[in-house]
C-alpha cells in the first residue's frame, strides 16, 4: 500500500536531516577543540609547574642576601714607605633592611698606621638612595675614637656614587666624611674610576694629628681590567693632601702634607 507524501512533508524531512548533520559537525569540532585545549594546558603545566600551597608558603617574601667587596686592595709607593691599603664593604640583609660594615686602613712596615671601621644599618628611602646610621671606630693613629653617625649613600645623576655621613664623637668632637666615585666604562671590561674622599672635623684632636676644619683629601684615578666581574686587577695614581690645622700639625712633626704616588692592586667580590 503506498502512502501519498506531500511536498511539504518531503521538505520538512530534508530540513531535519540538514539540521542533524550540522549538529553532528558542531559536536565533532567541539570535541576536537576540547582535546586541543586540554593538550595545550598539559604542555603549559609541564613547562610551568604550579606551586602547591605548601611550596608557596615555604618561599620567603623578602630573601636575605650578602656580599663582601674589596673595592681597593692595593700597594702604594708613598713618599716615605711602601704601604698596603684597603677599602672594603660587607653587607647582609634584605631589600629593606641591611647591616653594612665598612673598613678602611693602611699598613706600613708590618704595623697598622690607619684603621677605620663603620658598622651601619641601611634602609632605602628613595630610588637609588639609602639612609645609613650606626657607629664608627678609628683605632689608628693615636688614641681610639668612637662616633655615632647618620648619612646617605646612593647614585646621584650621571651615576655618580655618593657616600656622605655626619658624625658625633667623644668630648664634643664632630666630623663629616664625603666620598664621590664614578665608573667610566671604556669597554665591557676596561673601567676608569676617578674618586675623591674628604674629611672635616669640628675640633682639634692633637693626639691623633687632626685639626679643626677641612682636614684632608684623597683624589685617585684607577684603571682596571675585569678578567671576571668578580676579579679585576688595576693600576692608578693617587694624590693626598692635608689642609688647615691638620697640615700645621703635620709640619710640626716633620711630616709631608702633600704626596702623589702610584698604586697597583686588586678589586674582588663574592
What are these regions, as identified by a protein language model?
Residues 8, 13, 38-111, 115, ...:
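Outer-membrane beta-barrel initiation region
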Residues 221-226, 257-270:
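Outer-membrane beta-barrel "beta-signal"
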Residues 72, 101-105, 133-137, 164-168, ...:
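Transmembrane beta-barrel strands of outer-membrane/channel proteins
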Residues 144-205:
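Detector for outer-membrane/organellar transmembrane beta-barrel domains
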Residues 88, 119, 150, 178-180, ...:
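Membrane-embedded beta-strands of outer-membrane beta-barrel proteins
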Residues 96-100, 127-131, 158-162, 187-192, ...:
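Repeated loop/turn-to-beta-strand initiation elements of outer-membrane beta-barrel proteins
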Residues 92-94, 123, 154, 168, ...:
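Residue-level signature of outer-membrane beta-barrel architecture
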Residues 64-66, 82-86, 113-115, 144-148, ...:
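Residues that define the transmembrane beta-barrel architecture of outer-membrane proteins
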Amino acid at each position: 500500500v503506498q502512502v501519498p507524501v506531500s511536498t511539504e512533508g518531503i521538505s520538512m524531512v530534508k530540513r531535519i536531516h540538514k539540521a542533524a548533520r550540522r549538529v553532528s559537525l558542531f559536536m565533532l569540532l567541539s570535541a576536537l577543540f576540547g582535546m586541543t585545549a586540554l593538550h595545550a594546558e598539559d604542555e603549559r603545566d609541564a613547562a610551568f609547574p604550579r606551586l602547591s600551597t605548601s611550596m608557596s608558603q615555604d618561599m620567603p617574601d623578602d630573601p636575605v642576601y650578602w656580599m663582601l667587596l674589596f673595592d681597593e686592595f692595593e700597594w702604594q709607593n708613598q713618599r716615605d714607605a711602601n704601604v698596603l691599603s684597603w677599602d672594603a664593604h660587607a653587607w647582609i640583609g634584605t631589600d629593606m633592611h641591611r647591616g653594612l660594615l665598612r673598613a678602611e686602613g693602611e699598613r706600613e712596615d708590618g704595623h697598622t698606621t690607619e684603621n677605620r671601621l663603620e658598622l651601619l644599618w641601611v634602609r632605602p628611602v628613595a630610588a637609588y638612595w639609602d639612609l645609613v646610621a650606626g657607629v664608627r671606630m678609628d683605632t689608628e693613629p693615636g688614641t681610639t675614637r668612637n662616633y655615632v653617625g647618620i648619612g646617605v649613600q646612593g647614585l646621584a645623576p650621571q651615576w655618580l656614587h655618593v657616600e656622605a655621613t655626619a658624625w658625633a664623637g667623644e668630648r664634643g668632637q664632630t666630623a663629616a666624611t664625603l666620598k664621590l666615585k664614578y665608573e667610566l666604562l671604556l669597554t665591557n671590561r676596561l673601567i676608569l674610576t676617578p674618586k675623591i674622599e674628604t674629611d672635616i672635623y669640628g675640633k682639634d684632636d692633637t693626639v691623633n694629628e687632626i685639626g679643626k676644619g677641612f682636614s684632608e683629601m684623597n683624589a685617585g684615578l684607577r684603571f682596571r681590567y675585569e678578567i671576571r666581574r668578580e676579579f679585576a686587577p688595576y693600576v692608578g695614581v693617587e694624590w693626598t693632601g692635608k689642609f688647615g690645622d691638620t697640615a700645621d700639625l703635620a709640619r710640626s712633626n716633620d711630616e709631608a702634607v702633600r704626596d702623589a704616588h702610584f698604586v697597583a692592586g686588586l678589586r674582588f667580590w663574592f
